[in-house]
């Protein structure tokens, strides 16, 4: 359970980073 929770947190963190990168890229090109 603990490992799955950690995996979920890492997955969510990657999604957040990705979103921020995407938003930065869109801001740079938009």
UniProtKB/Swiss-Prot annotation:
EC number of the protein: 1.3.1.31
Annotated protein name in UniProt: 2-enoate reductase
Keywords: Flavoprotein, Iron, Iron-sulfur, Metal-binding, NAD, Oxidoreductase
Catalytic activity: butanoate + NAD(+) = (2E)-2-butenoate + NADH + H(+)
Keyword ATP-binding: no
UniProt GO molecular function: 2-enoate reductase activity; iron-sulfur cluster binding; metal ion binding
The species this protein was found in: Clostridium tyrobutyricum
EC primary class: oxidoreductase
Function, in words: Involved in fermentation of amino acids (Stickland reaction) such as leucine, isoleucine, valine and phenylalanine.
Cofactor(s) required, per the database record: iron-sulfur cluster; FAD; FMN
Superkingdom field: Bacteria
Subunit structure: Dodecamer; tetramer of trimers.
